[in-house]
Amino acid sequence: MTPPHNYLAVIKVVGIGGGGVNAVNRMIEVGLKGVEFIAINTDAQALLMSDADVKLDVGRELTRGLGAGANPDVGKNAAEDHRDEIEEVLKGADMVFVTCGEGGGTGTGGAPVVANIARKLGALTIGVVTRPFSFEGKRRQVQAEAGIDELRNQCDTLIVIPNDRLLALGDRNISMMDAFRTADQVLLSGVQGITDLITTPGLINLDFADVKSVMSGAGSALMGIGSARGENRAVEAAEAAISSPLLEQSMDGARGVLLSIAGGSDLGLFEINDAAQLVTDAAHPDANIIFGAVIDDALGDEVRVTVIAAGFDGGTPAYKAAEPARKTNQNQPTQSSTPVVPSPATPAAPQSPRRVLFDDVDVPDFLKNGS
């Protein structure tokens, strides 16, 4: 008798360095399903705090478990020294996410090594990383750009989130911790927005082959997330997704687009059509647009749209100038382009099957409390 085959795509999320491991911890905390989590770090103490399925301390001889000292060369060498161990934990994956906060040591230097191994094993390899805040200094910025360039060469698709864009989200009174929490939620939404397309049954289903057709060898990519309620909710959610202040580049000219629309059982066909048309018009005329829709009654009257745009001419999207923070229009309180962070007085609602997300935050050393 032929043994049963596992037809589910094997998805692994690798967080490397302090920022990457923090991102993985956040995904575990909210209950992201259908993936295996791997935490890699040169800081043995910080690694002990992770709840990842697999924890790998690299550079044991090189750093003695004390971290890379914000030196990407140390991070790279540490990962290279444990290349066989990294390969072993990545074996069998169909898709590998590599996430880190660019600009430091372990993540910046080690992420390209991890991506290189994953891609050689035949996995669709997607990088989701952050560019550091300007206040973190010139050296960190320079290291981040070099790390991003190197990681782009090793990934099928690379999504970069600039932390400075968090400052354009509107509220000048937001606390430092809430800003970082928002960034964690965006990163979560980025990874989950892709994995849900594969792992969550939908009204219009997508599978791993659909995602791969857009993201394999696509180079730089953009992701947008939007949600809205009310009469024009689907179109407003789509508009929010393609014009998110977290996107520093325009999706004009994208030749590959993944589009996911989620709503309650009252989600209408014409709503879906109007939202999809809006996204289609923003992409390249000959774009390969892969579309999925899911019914999730937990969303109530809310519609959520996730857009991933890739495959740009020249390999990178066109630059979009930053816009100053705008005051919230109190007459239109239903539209949002970023995930909402629950207030301390309000317990977080259970994570719905179709929530979307996207960003890893590079926490400054003075906020790490020695971790």
Place the predicted regions along the sequence by residue.
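Tubulin/FtsZ superfamily GTPase core signature
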Residues: M1-S371
